[in-house]
Amino acid sequence: MKTALHSISYSGSWGQAKLPLEEIVQRASTLGYDGIMLAGKRPHASLLDMTPEVRSELRSRMTDAKIEMSCLAGYTNFTADAEHAEVPHREMQIHYVTELSRLAVDLGGTIVRIFTGYEQPLRPYSKAWDLTVSAVKECARRAADVGAIIAVQNHHDLAAHSDAFLMFLKAVDESNCRAAFDAWSPALQSDDYLTAAKKLAPQTVHTTIADYVRVPRFRYQPELVNYRRDEDYIQAVPMGEGFIDYRGFLKALCDHGFDGCVAYEMCSPLRDGNSLEVLDQYARKFAEFMKAHFAYSRSGGYSLHAMK
C-alpha cells in the first residue's frame, strides 16, 4: 500500500484554508505521503486550466518532490437533471471522464476516481441504475483506450450499500472498471464494512479514508417536556479518534488481495477548526497512523506482513 494526500482537503470547499496545487504537492512530500490525489476541478486540476504546459510543469514538480500521481478524482453524477432530458448530461460527463483519463496518464498516473449518481423522484431506481451502468461502462472503455483505470467510489446514493456496489461493478463488467471502496460509507450505514472489505478487496485499487465521531442530537418538545432523538451529526476528527476501525479495514482489504493506494481526505468541517495548521495536523496524524501500524519502505510502501 502507498499513501496519498487528497488535494480537496486544501481546496477551501468547507471553509478551510486553500492552497494552490504546487504547494499541496510540496506539502504531501513534507508530511510524509507517497503521492497525491488530485481533485479534477477548480481550484486544482480542472481540465479548463490544465494546458500541456501546466501538465508538464506539474509533473516535473511531482518528480522533484518524489510524489507520485496516485489518483485523479473525478466528480460525476450520472443521474443529474432528470427534469431536462434534452441536455446531454451523461455525454458531457463521459467526455469529462475521458479527458480526465488523458490528464491522469499525462501526469504519470492511471487511476481516475468517479461517482455513480444520486437518486431523485423523477427517475425510477431501475432506470437510474441502467443509465449509470451504461455511462460507467462507456467511461471504462474510453479510459482503456488511453491506458487509464476507472475506480468507482461508494459515495453517491446509487449502489451505496456494499452488496449493491458489488452488483453494480458486475453489471458494468469491464476489466478496467474497478472499486474505490471506502469504509466510512458502510460504517455510517451500520453495514459490516470488514466483511464487505473482504468481498470487495480483489476489485479494489484505491480507498479514501476519513475518520468521524457521532454527535448525538435531540430536539426539545415542550408539549411533552421531553426530547425527540434526531439523526446524529457526523463530525470529522483526526485519524484514530473516530469510530471506524481502519486498522481492521485495511487488514481485511490486504488479506484478500488489495495492494493499492490509501488516500487521506478532509472533506467536511473539522472538529478543531479550518486553519492551515489544523489541516496539516490532521494530515500528519494520518501519516503517523500508517507508520504506527504498518512497516514502511519507500519502494514498496506499507506492508501488511509486518503489521505492528
Report residues per predicted region.
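N-terminal small/glycine-rich loop or linker at the start of catalytic domains
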Residues: M1-G12, S70-E83, T116-E119
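Histidine-acidic metal/acid-base catalytic patches
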Residues: M1-G32, G108, A159-F181, S185-K308
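Active-site acidic/histidine proton-transfer and metal-coordination neighborhood
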Residues: E22-Q26, R61-E68, A80-A179, L304
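Short, conserved active-site loops that position catalytic residues or coordinate cofactors/metal ions
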Residues: L31-R42, C71-T76
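Conserved beta-strand positions in the central sheet of alpha/beta enzyme cores
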Residues: M37, C71, R113, A151, ...
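Glycine-rich, proline-tolerant flexible connector loops at the mouths of alpha/beta enzymes
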Residues: M37-R59, G117-R123
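The substrate-binding groove and active-site-proximal loops of carbohydrate-active enzymes
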Residues: H44, E83-E91, A236-G240
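Short, small-residue-enriched loops and turns at beta-alpha junctions
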Residues: H44-S46, T79-A80, E119-P121, H156-A159, ...
